[in-house]
C-alpha cells in the first residue's frame, strides 16, 4: 500500500506545477502534461518517490540519525515548525543564515548565546538589570529565538536535510552538497532534481500540498523512532496564508542575524 494515495494528492493539489514558461527542463521526466499553460505533475511518480523517501527516512530514524527541516516561505513556515517538533527534529523556517552548516562552529556560538539569554530570562536575572540594558538583551533574545529557535538543541550538523522548495533554499542545498549531507526535497516544476538525493515532485506553493508531503516525512521519522504512529492531527493554523504565493526572486540570506532595519524591509 502506498504511503500516500493518488486521491489524497489530487485533493491536496500536489499535481499543480508552475506556468509552463517557468519550468526547468530537468523536471520533464516528472511532468505528465500541461493544461491552460500550467504543468501537471505525474502523481504516479510522486507516489513512487514518496515511498522511497518514506522508507529512507524511517530507516535513518531507526539508526538514530538527526534531521533538519528547512522551509522559509510563508506557506511552509508553520508546517515545518510543527511537523519537525512532532517528530523530534530540528528546523529552520525564517531565514537561512549563510554558513548555517558549513560554518557551524560560529553559528553554535549564537545558539549558545540564545540558551544563555533564555536561562537569564527564566531565572529573572534580566529583571535585575537597568531597564535599557534589559530591553536590549530581550530584543537580542527575540531575534535569536526567531532565527535559531528551531536548532536550539542541535549539537552538530544534521545527518539528513528535508527541504521545501529547492530553488528558494539554494544556499541550504549548496551547503549540504559541500558537506555531503543527503537531501530529501519537494520539487516543483521550476526546480532542479539533479541537486537533491531523493526528489519528490510536488506543488511546493500550496499549503495543503506541503502539509501532506511534509507530514508524511515526519510520520516516517516518528515511526522509525517509536515503531508506530500517533493519530493524525489536523492543522488549522495555516489556513490564513494564500496558496497562490509566487516565488520571490529577490530573497537573500545573510551570515548574521538580521538587524531591525532589515527586518522592517
Swiss-Prot record:
Q: What's the protein called, per UniProt?
A: Small ribosomal subunit protein uS2
Q: Which family does it belong to?
A: Belongs to the universal ribosomal protein uS2 family.
Name its species: Trichormus variabilis (strain ATCC 29413 / PCC 7937)
What keywords is this UniProt entry annotated with?
Ribonucleoprotein, Ribosomal protein
This protein's GO cellular component annotations are:
cytosolic small ribosomal subunit
Gene Ontology MF term list = structural constituent of ribosome
Disulphide bond pairs = none
Q: Which GO terms describe its biological process?
A: translation
Q: Where is this region: Disordered?
A: 231-265
